[in-house]
């Protein structure tokens, strides 16, 4: 019998590799399955590049299975070589603990806790930290062949430039994790990104060697790619974080709404919980009326609401509409800073107040003649209000919070003027 969840994952394009396709399907049809996905606390927030494996784990929870969310307080002290061309910088224990705290809060936004199939949050330092060096070498290292490890892509790719013994042992530590969760919490499936295949299969192999035949499986999801070849998960400002202090909900919303027609349907399948019928309808809308950008708006709304909540989504939409219409007066200083984070930043002396001189000194207009023309022609806006008086002097109330002024030239060229 085909499993409904597996069918949905296949339709969404979320299955990259499985250790035993039929075995996983039979298991899901037979029982409520406990499965896990992990992340090392390399920062105090996840970014959207981390999101897909955990959203996939959440889909299992939606179908009645129990997710374990593992935060690598132990492995995070070591560093995963997978997908990295050079050695990671080791973090202090204090920094790792701070990162764990931040990521744990975000997991409570992604998963349901406290139900009969509620998520379980674990930290692998709790068991890895109890293993002595002698025990590590005798009880675990004895079962892992060096040739086997050298065959792993994550190791092979680093051999030419060098890899420390610290990172070389990482895959064994992750293998121990899967074995521990399998024995202690009856965890039978590990979910991860495609770069985790080697670590996942190492865990299954270690269990087989230590315990004999073991009911354990692995499933990986594809690397998220964009049609233009650019790296997914980056905006002009850098990584798109789940932490609202690092990436505001407005910036988060804008990232999703700006996805291309070529990518938006794939991302609706990947990152939202909308069903096939609704996504098919949005695909039809994209094909027949692409100018409406209904698919992009839906993607932005669904993901922003899921991560940040309905109030934050409404604020993001309000800011977007105000910036689009030029109604800047309705926004707070923080909202304006968020909204204009990526526009050119120019610095102005507090002594310069005449509008023409302001335009010249900041380089907004290329010459005095052009500056006067811009003002006379109604092309200059101060904080959203048109200014056509060439003798106008910037007043204290034009300085938002006494810090900056937003000047627009023409229809779309915005500048943030900061004072010194």
UniProtKB/Swiss-Prot annotation:
Catalytic activity: tRNA(Tyr) + L-tyrosine + ATP = L-tyrosyl-tRNA(Tyr) + AMP + diphosphate + H(+)
SMART domains xrefs: S4
Signal peptide feature range: none
EC number: 6.1.1.1
Residues of the S4 RNA-binding domain: 353-420
Membrane-spanning segments: none
Positions annotated to bind ATP: 234
Pfam families linked: SYY_C-terminal, tRNA-synt_1b
GO biological process: tyrosyl-tRNA aminoacylation
Compartment(s) where it occurs, according to its Swiss-Prot or TrEMBL record: Cytoplasm
Primary site of residence: cytoplasm
NCBIfam families per record: tyrS
Function: Catalyzes the attachment of tyrosine to tRNA(Tyr) in a two-step reaction: tyrosine is first activated by ATP to form Tyr-AMP and then transferred to the acceptor end of tRNA(Tyr).
Family: Belongs to the class-I aminoacyl-tRNA synthetase family. TyrS type 1 subfamily.
Protein name stated in the entry: Tyrosine--tRNA ligase
Lineage: Bacteria, Bacillati, Bacillota, Bacilli, Bacillales
Gene: tyrS
């Amino acid at each position: 019998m085909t499993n409904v969840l597996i069918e949905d994952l296949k339709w969404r394009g979320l299955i990259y590799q499985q250790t035993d396709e039929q075995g996983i399907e039979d298991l899901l049809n037979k029982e409520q399955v406990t499965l896990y996905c992990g992340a090392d606390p390399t920062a105090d927030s996840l970014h959207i590049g981390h999101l897909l494996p955990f959203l996939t784990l959440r889909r299992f929870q939606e179908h009645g299975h129990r997710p374990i969310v593992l935060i690598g307080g132990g492995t995070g002290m070591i560093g995963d070589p997978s997908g990295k061309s050079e050695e990671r910088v080791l973090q202090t224990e204090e920094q790792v603990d701070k990162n764990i705290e931040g990521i744990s809060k975000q997991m409570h936004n992604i998963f349901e806790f406290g139900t009969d199939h509620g998520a379980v949050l674990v930290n692998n330092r709790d068991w890895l930290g109890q293993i002595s060096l002698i025990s590590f070498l005798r009880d675990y290292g004895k079962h892992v062949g060096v040739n086997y490890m050298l065959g792993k892509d994550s190791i092979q790719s680093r051999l030419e430039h060098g890899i420390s013994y610290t990172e070389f042992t990482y895959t064994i530590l992750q293998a121990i994790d899967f074995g521990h969760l399998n024995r202690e919490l009856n965890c039978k499936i590990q979910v991860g990104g495609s770069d985790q295949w080697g670590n996942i299969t190492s865990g299954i192999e270690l269990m087989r060697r230590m315990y004999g035949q073991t009911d354990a499986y692995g499933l990986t999801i594809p690397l998220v790619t964009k049609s233009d070849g650019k790296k997914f998960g980056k905006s002009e400002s850098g990584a798109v974080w789940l932490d609202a202090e690092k990436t505001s909900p407005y910036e988060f919303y804008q990232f999703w709404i700006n996805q291309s027609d070529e990518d938006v349907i794939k991302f609706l399948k990947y990152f939202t919980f909308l069903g096939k019928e609704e996504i098919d309808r949005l695909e039809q809308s994209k094909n027949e009326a692409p100018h409406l950008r209904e698919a992009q708006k839906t993607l932005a709304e669904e993901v922003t609401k899921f991560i940040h909540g309905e109030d934050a989504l409404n604020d993001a939409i309000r800011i977007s509409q105000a910036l689009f219409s030029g109604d800047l007066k309705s926004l707070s200083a923080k909202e304006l800073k968020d909204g204009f984070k990526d526009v050119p930043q120019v610095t102005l002396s507090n002594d310069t107040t005449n509008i023409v001189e302001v335009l010249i000194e900041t380089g907004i207009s290329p010459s005095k003649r052009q500056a006067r023309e811009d003002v006379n022609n109604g092309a200059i806006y101060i904080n959203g209000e048109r200014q056509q008086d060439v003798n106008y002097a910037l007043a204290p109330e034009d300085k938002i919070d006494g810090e900056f002024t937003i000047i627009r030239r023409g229809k779309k060229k915005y500048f943030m003027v900061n004072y010194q």
